[in-house]
């Protein structure tokens, strides 16, 4: 079941923490999150899943930044969130999507117990000018049935900045590396 906007407000500072919080950003069943003024872009192409790919920071000026089409930008929300006993999910706002701007490519699903800023995987189908502090996406909450095991991963928990991929740290790739050396 998805929580209503009124229920989000009722659970604020309990199961749901959003800082800073502004009641004007509440929707009927979600809360709008704003775009921070920093982005990151990967410096090399192609990227390698097994490597810590270098990225550089870009600042979005107040008068906007023109994004290139078919290029991945990593951004983050201004708002810090914590979610307890609920599953947080992130989606782009329909007005943003209608401009051909995607705010998450695949990672819109959060875990019970996640604490931090949401890293956005921003991708546009045509050049588009973006601005800092715009309400770019919305967070909504699902209730959980059954016993809850809170999120404990150290990869992204408690982040304070934009997070590039840490897939290279995954255990499965340690196995893959071992397999590569034995198969050659």
Name what the model sees in each region.
Residues 32, 40, 69-132, 137-150:
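Glycine-rich active-site loops that engage anionic ligands at enzyme catalytic sites
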Residues 20-23, 64, 108-110, 127:
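A generic local secondary-structure boundary/capping motif
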Residues 7-8, 12, 138-173:
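Conserved, short, structured surface segments that act as functional micro-motifs
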Residues 42-56, 88-93:
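Short Gly/aromatic-enriched secondary-structure transition segments
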Residues 50-70:
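A short mixed-secondary-structure module that forms the rim of ligand-binding clefts
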Residues 1-37, 45-48, 164-173:
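Short, low-complexity N-terminal leaders and the immediately following helix N-cap/first helix
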Residues 174-181:
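Conserved small/polar residues in nucleotide/adenosyl-binding loops
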Residues 16-20, 58-61, 105:
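Glycine-rich, charged/polar anion/phosphate-binding loops
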């Amino acid at each position: 079941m998805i929580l209503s906007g009124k229920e989000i407000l009722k659970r604020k500072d309990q199961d749901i923490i959003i800082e800073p919080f502004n009641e004007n950003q509440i929707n009927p069943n979600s809360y709008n999150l704003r775009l921070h003024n920093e982005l990151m872009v990967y410096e090399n192409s192609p990227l390698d899943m097994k490597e810590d790919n270098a990225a550089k920071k870009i600042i979005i000026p107040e008068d906007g930044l023109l994004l290139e089409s078919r290029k991945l930008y990593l951004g983050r929300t201004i708002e810090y969130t914590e979610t307890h006993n609920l599953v947080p999910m992130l989606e782009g706002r329909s007005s943003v999507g209608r401009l051909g701007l995607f705010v998450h490519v695949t990672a819109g699903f959060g875990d019970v117990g996640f604490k931090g800023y949401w890293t956005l995987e921003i991708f546009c189908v045509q050049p588009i000018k973006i601005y800092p502090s715009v309400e770019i996406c919305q967070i909504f909450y699902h209730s959980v049935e059954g016993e809850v095991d809170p999120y404990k991963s150290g990869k992204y928990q408690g982040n304070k900045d934009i997070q590039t991929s840490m897939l290279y740290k995954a255990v499965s790739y340690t196995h893959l590396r071992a397999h590569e050396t034995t198969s050659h």
